[in-house]
Amino acid sequence: MTATACYGIIPARYDSSRFPGKPLADIQGRPMFWHVWHRASLCPQLQQVVLATDDGRIAEAAHALDVPYVMTRSDHPSGTDRVFEAATLLQLDEDAVVVNIQGDEPALEPRMLSELVRPFAEDAAVQVTTLARAISPQQAACPDVVKVVCTAGGDALYFSRAAIPYCRDGQSGAPCMGHVGLYAFRYQALRRFTQLEQSVLERTEKLEQLRLLENNIPIRVVETAYRTHGVDRPGDIDVIINMIRENEG
């Protein structure tokens, strides 16, 4: 394997229509972003994990807790764009691997990040990676669960909110795989992604990863057995606290 420098960046914005101030939500006496940073920092492949925010309140809390952070612009259309600005401010090398770590996953399993970055050390041609896991037929039918189908070599063919693959004969066939929204990019691939216009399929499915596929940028998909649980609303905090207690136990 070739040694590859890997960095984790956590985009954290204060404004949220469903949960304003979410990164600062208290979980067992610490803000949510601290838990995400702490869990990600347990991944041995990541040389550094940094918070990327445009909000002074989040920056002040990060400073108080000794969490590395960078201040970014407030006009980014997506978290991926914020991650790219942060990577640029950190002056990362062209071949560095940048992991986009969701800021609302305080019970993140660090081994998922290890799975995510491993292909970069095994194959110099890999530009982007993500994760997927097996799901039930009921989950496959839900448009909120994004599905992915892959080539024999593990690269994504397509992501969709529809049930793919569709089993015409109603018998068991290829398993349904649900996409897990973690991404890692080589720095130059991340830069190119942010320079591309939104694609037709991206706008249709409301899935930004389709921009990569439509522009012939392959995405290596790694199967994982681990699960994540994001925080969308204040009521999700209790679930997260139970997950953190299980991890600590």
UniProtKB/Swiss-Prot annotation:
Main location: cytoplasm
Record key words, sorted: Cytoplasm, Lipopolysaccharide biosynthesis, Nucleotidyltransferase, Transferase
SUPFAM superfamilies: Nucleotide-diphospho-sugar transferases
Cell location: Cytoplasm
Any Pfam family hit: CTP_transf_3
Molecular function terms from GO: 3-deoxy-manno-octulosonate cytidylyltransferase activity
Keyword presence, Methyltransferase: no
GO cellular component: cytosol
EC number: 2.7.7.38
InterPro entries with a match to the protein in the record: Cytidylyl_trans, KdsB, Nucleotide-diphossugar_trans
GO biological process: CMP-keto-3-deoxy-D-manno-octulosonic acid biosynthetic process; lipopolysaccharide biosynthetic process
Pathway assigned to this chain's UniProt record: Nucleotide-sugar biosynthesis; CMP-3-deoxy-D-manno-octulosonate biosynthesis; CMP-3-deoxy-D-manno-octulosonate from 3-deoxy-D-manno-octulosonate and CTP: step 1/1; Bacterial outer membrane biogenesis; lipopolysaccharide biosynthesis
Homology family: Belongs to the KdsB family.
Record protein name field: 3-deoxy-manno-octulosonate cytidylyltransferase
